[in-house]
Amino acid sequence: MEPLHIINVYPETISDGFGVRYAIYLAGCTHHCRGCHNPGSWSPVAGEPLTELILSRIVAEINDNPILDGITISGGDPFYNPFALLALLRRLKEETHKNVWCYTGYTYESLLKDETRRPCLDYIDTLVDGPVSYTHLRAH
């Protein structure tokens, strides 16, 4: 299994879902959405490999922080490497018991039809899905 690569972690953020969240940004994306806020994440080898040591540190940081409401997985596209994502999600849910948000360029419907990606949905509480689109945004 190809290892996940982490671009960045934000131990406390209010920008990646409701409440205070621990955000993990993963590398790898094939969508290449126009207006992407993180094009440096498209390469699957950007950042650093997610080692057991790094993952253990992340789990400990999450469990040691009483103000966290949950975990957010973003990127890139977390579903770029679905088998490694599944292992990560399973470990985070089992060891932290936090709710998990995941941002992806895939639609929910396409993930349901994809046998390699669908199992990840069992460990995601909130899915923010679909490609980035700025056609419906207006400044007020």
Q: Could you tell me what each predicted segment is?
A:
Residues T30, D77, Y106, V132-S133:
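Short, flexible active-site-adjacent loop segments at beta-strand->alpha-helix junctions, enriched
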